[in-house]
C-alpha cells in the first residue's frame, strides 16, 4: 500500500530533477527533489505545533501552491486533511469543523472566518492562514522547521483514515466522506487505467480545480505527480488566463467539470489553436451538453473522455468516446456495479431496457469507509456490501448504462416517472433560455406538477413560447412542464449545483399567491 506522500516520494526517487510544481503567483517552482524537501520542512513545522498521526486538520483554501504542499506535509505525518470548500460561508465552515471533531485548521486570511472557526475549535488549537501571494499577516509561511527532527514514516494500516472530503451539500450541510489509506493508490490506478495514462506520461497539467474536489485532488494534482508530470497552479480560475496558460505552457492534460470548459470556450480570447497541445481531456462531476462536447472534440487536441464517479467512489464508470452518446457509460477496471429497481435490494436487478438505481460494490478499494459522524446516513447508503449512489441509469444489453440523473430529483406525475435531465436540455436549447431547472411540486390532481424554473436570455422567452418549443421537440406530453417561473438567476450552492429545495419553496409559494414571482400555468 502506497500513501499519498509515498506516491510522490517515489516519483521524486525516479526523477528528482524533473519539474514537479510551478506557481502562477510567485516565481516558485520545485523539482521533485525540492518538493519533497519543502514538504519535509513543513511537516516538521506542523509536528512542532502538535500535528501528528490521526490529527484532523481542516483546510478551506483555493488550489494554491502552498495548499498542495500542506496536504503532502500532513500526509507525511499521517494526519488527516479535511478538505472544505473555501466558498462555503464562515458559518458553514465552522459548523462542519465542530461537527467533524476537527483539531486544527488552515484558512484564508479573513478575520470573520478566523473568529468563527476559533470558536468551533479547542482553545489551544492550531489555526494557520495562507494566501496566494504569501502576504504579511499570514502564518503558514513560518511553518517550517528542521526536517532532520522528523522521525520515520508512521506505520499506517489500510483502514486508517487518510482524508475527509465533503459532498456538495445540495440537500443540506455537506457530509464528510471518510477515505481510508487503501483508497489513494487505487483511485490513481483506476484513473490512469481508464483514462489511458501509462506510467511516465509526464503530464503537463493545468491545476485550477480546487483540491477540496475529488477531481481537483486525485484527478488533477495527485495523478500528475504520481506520473512524474508537472502541475501548473492556477490559484484562481479565470477562463481568459486559462486559455493563455494552455497555449503558453503547452498543457497536455486537463480534468474538470463541464461548466469550466464552457467558460474557457466562451472567453473572449478563446481560439481553437490555443488548445492544440492538449492530448487528453477528461470531464465529470456534472452532465455535459452535447454541443459543448462536440466542440471540444472538434477543436481541441487529443481525446475527450467522460469519467463518472462520486466523492464516495471517485471512479466507477467511464466512456472513452462520449461524442454522440454523452450519457453512455461502462464499468471500469475492477469495478462491479448493478442497476436495481428503485427502493430494491442488490438482487433486484432490472432487465435490459429498464431504468433503476446504480449501486457500486462497496468492497472496491476505491470506495469510502463512512460518513463522518453520520452513522444513520452511512447505514442508509452502505447496505448489504453495496453503495447506493442515488443515480438513475438505463441498462443496456451489453452491460453499458445511460446516466439519467439523481433519484432525489425524480418527479412522479400522473403515475409516470419524469427526470429533470430529460426536459432541461430541451429547454436550454431554446435561444431565449440561458439556464433552467425542472422540479416537481405537490399537486392534488397529478401527485406532483412539473414546473420549469427558467432564466431568460437577452432574446427573451415566454411560457407559451417555451411550451411550443417543447411540443415541437417531440418531448412526450406528460413530461412537459405544466407551469413556468422566470428568475434572474437560479439558486446554487458553493459547488455551483442548483438548490432545488429552494426552487420547490419558491414555486409552492408562488402557486399559493405568497410570492411576487409569477407562477404561469399552461
Where are the predicted features?
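AMP-binding/adenylate-forming catalytic domain of the ANL superfamily
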Residues: 475-497, 516-522
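AMP-binding/adenylate-forming catalytic core of the ANL superfamily
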Residues: 88, 107, 364, 369-370, ...
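Structural core segment of the AMP-binding/adenylate-forming
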Residues: 7, 48-49, 72, 76-143, ...
Amino acid at each position: 500500500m502506497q500513501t499519498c506522500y509515498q506516491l510522490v516520494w517515489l516519483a521524486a526517487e525516479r526523477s528528482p530533477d524533473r519539474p514537479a510544481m510551478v506557481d502562477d503567483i510567485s516565481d516558485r517552482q520545485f523539482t521533485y527533489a525540492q518538493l519533497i524537501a519543502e514538504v519535509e520542512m513543513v511537516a516538521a513545522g506542523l509536528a512542532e505545533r502538535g500535528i501528528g498521526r490521526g490529527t484532523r486538520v481542516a483546510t478551506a483554501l483555493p488550489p494554491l501552491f502552498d495548499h498542495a504542499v500542506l496536504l503532502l506535509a500532513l500526509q507525511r505525518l499521517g494526519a488527516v486533511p479535511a478538505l472544505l470548500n473555501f466558498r462555503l460561508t464562515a458559518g458553514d465552515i465552522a459548523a462542519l469543523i465542530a461537527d467533524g471533531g476537527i483539531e486544527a485548521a488552515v484558512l484564508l486570511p479573513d478575520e470573520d472566518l478566523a473568529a468563527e472557526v476559533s470558536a468551533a475549535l479547542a482553545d489551544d488549537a492550531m489555526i494557520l492562514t495562507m494566501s496566494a501571494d504569501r502576504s504579511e499577516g499570514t502564518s503558514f509561511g513560518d511553518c517550517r522547521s528542521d526536517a532532520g527532527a522528523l522521525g520515520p514514516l508512521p506505520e499506517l494500516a489500510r483502514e486508517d483514515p487518510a482524508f475527509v472530503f465533503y459532498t456538495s451539500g445540495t440537500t443540506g450541510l455537506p457530509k464528510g466522506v471518510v477515505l481510508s489509506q487503501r483508497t489513494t493508490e487505487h483511485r490513481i490506478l483506476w484513473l490512469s487505467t481508464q483514462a489511458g495514462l501509462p506510467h511516465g506520461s509526464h503530464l503537463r497539467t493545468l491545476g485550477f480545480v480546487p483540491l477540496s474536489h475529488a477531481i481537483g485532488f486525485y484527478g488533477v494534482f495527485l495523478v500528475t505527480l504520481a506520473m512524474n508530470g508537472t502541475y501548473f497552479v492556477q490559484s484562481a480560475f479565470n477562463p481568459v488566463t486559462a486559455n493563455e496558460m494552455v497555449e503558453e505552457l503547452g498543457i497536455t492534460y486537463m480534468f474538470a467539470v463541464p461548466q469550466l470548459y464552457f467558460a474557457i470556450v466562451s472567453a473572449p480570447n478563446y481560439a481553437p489553436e490555443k488548445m492544440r497541445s492538449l492530448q487528453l481531456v477528461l470531464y465529470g462531476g456534472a452532465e455535459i451538453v452535447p454541443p459543448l462536447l462536440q466542440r471540444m472534440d472538434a477543436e481541441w487536441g487529443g481525446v475527450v473522455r467522460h469519467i463518472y464517479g462520486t466523492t464516495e467512489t471517485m471512479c466507477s464508470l467511464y466512456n472513452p468516446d462520449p461524442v454522440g452518446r454523452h450519457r453512455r457509460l461502462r464499468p471500469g477496471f475492477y469495478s462491479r456495479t448493478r442497476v436495481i429497481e428503485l427502493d430494491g435490494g442488490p438482487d433486484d436487478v432490472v432487465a435490459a431496457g429498464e431504468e433503476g438505481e446504480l449501486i457500486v460494490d462497496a468492497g472496491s478499494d476505491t470506495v469510502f469507509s463512512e460518513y463522518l459522524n453520520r452513522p444513520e446516513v452511512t447505514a442508509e447508503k452502505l447496505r448489504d456490501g453495496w453503495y447506493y449512489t442515488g443515480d438513475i441509469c438505463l441498462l443496456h444489453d451489453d452491460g453499458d448504462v445511460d446516466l439519467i440523473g439523481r433519484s432525489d430529483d425524480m418527479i412522479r406525475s400522473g403515475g409516470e416517472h419524469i427526470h429533470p435531465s430529460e426536459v432541461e436540455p430541451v429547454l436550454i436549447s431554446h435561444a431565449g433560455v440561458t439556464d433552467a431547472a425542472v422540479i416537481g411540486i405537490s399537486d392534488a390532481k397529478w401527485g406532483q406538477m412539473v414546473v420549469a424554473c427558467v432564466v431568460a436570455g437577452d432574446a427573451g422567452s415566454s411560457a407559451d413560447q417555451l411550451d411550443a418549443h417543447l411540443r415541437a421537440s417531440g418531448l412526450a406530453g406528460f413530461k412537459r412542464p405544466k407551469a413556468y417561473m422566470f428568475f434572474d438567476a437560479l439558486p446554487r450552492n458553493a459547488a455551483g449545483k442548483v438548490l432545488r429545495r429552494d426552487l420547490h419553496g419558491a414555486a409552492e409559494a408562488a402557486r399559493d399567491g405568497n410570492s411576487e414571482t409569477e407562477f404561469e400555468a399552461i
